[in-house]
Curated annotation (Swiss-Prot):
Protein name listed in UniProt: Protein erg2 homolog
Membrane side Extracellular: residue ranges: 45-93
Role of this protein: May function in lipid transport from the endoplasmic reticulum and be involved in a wide array of cellular functions probably through regulation of the biogenesis of lipid microdomains at the plasma membrane. May regulate calcium efflux at the endoplasmic reticulum.
Gene transcribed to yield this protein: erg2
Organism of this sequence: Dictyostelium discoideum
Subcellular localization, as worded in the UniProt entry: Endoplasmic reticulum membrane; Cell membrane
Residue spans crossing the bilayer: 24-44, 94-114
GO MF term list: C-8 sterol isomerase activity
Keyword terms: Cell membrane, Endoplasmic reticulum, Lipid transport, Membrane, Transmembrane, Transmembrane helix, Transport
Length: 233
């Protein structure tokens, strides 16, 4: 900074404004670096709290493949409780889900700030946008088939019962569920930032906020239990 120009500054506000005007790039870079550092810190903190294993979840899902869907949910639920008795809810509560143009129903099995686990699916055909999140998402197919595609790819990728798809962090896809498609969906990462995906569809598209309120109740209850009782973020 020019020394003689500095002498003309009479107070701190003038000095601060002059500093900002002369160093916008430095300040912008500093803010960006701070945001990235905070995100990395949160990510590391959350990943240390991961309890659910994708290999175990896949094996649990296979217990229900080929069974009538009610029996499949029961069998998978029991397997999950056997492996994670302290983290899986004992009761299944179903509610409507709208997000990214798709509609189905879901049942919350586990929810914390770093992980979620749900049953999800639809007896009808449904398609939409996956959303783009700060988390990884796994869909373990129980029944039916889901299809997905990515930008620049012109053939769909099919995932029948017994298989699973993986959506990396900050990647989006188009997808569809064929009629009577059901899955066990697992996400790990910064879970709270995914809530607007569900919220905005409930408020601005369907005008039905009841499912969202129900989801907030079930998810909030599990998150609170994990934080206060199990000391899990």
């Amino acid at each position: 900074m020019d020394y003689f120009k500095t002498l003309e500054i009479n107070n701190f506000n003038d000095y601060l404004n002059h500093l900002i005007q002369g160093n916008k790039v430095v300040i912008g870079t500093s803010i960006l670096g701070l945001v990235i550092a905070i995100f990395i810190f949160i990510k590391i903190k959350l990943m240390r709290c991961i309890e659910l294993d994708t290999k175990i979840l896949h094996e649990c899902t296979k217990k229900g493949v080929g069974l009538p869907i009610d029996e499949a949910f029961e069998a998978i639920h029991k397997e999950l409780i056997k492996h994670y008795p302290q983290f899986i809810t004992a009761k299944r509560n179903w509610l409507l889900f709208n997000g990214g143009g798709a509609m189905g129903q879901m049942c919350v099995l586990h929810a914390s700030l770093s992980e979620y686990l749900i049953f999800y699916g639809t007896p009808l055909y449904s398609q939409g946008h996956s959303g783009r999140y700060l988390m990884d998402v796994y869909d373990f197919m129980i029944q039916g088939t889901t299809k997905q595609f990515f930008p620049g790819k012109f053939q769909s990728i099919d995932f029948p019962a017994g298989k699973f798809s993986y959506l990396p962090m900050m990647v989006a896809k188009g997808y569809c569920c064929e009629p009577n498609s059901w899955m066990l969906e697992y996400g790990r990462g910064v879970i709270p930032l995914a809530l607007p995906y569900f919220l905005f569809s409930s408020i601005f598209v369907t005008l039905d906020i009841v499912p969202w309120i129900s989801a907030v109740f079930y998810v909030g209850r599990e998150v609170t239990k994990n934080l206060l009782i199990r000391r899990k973020i």
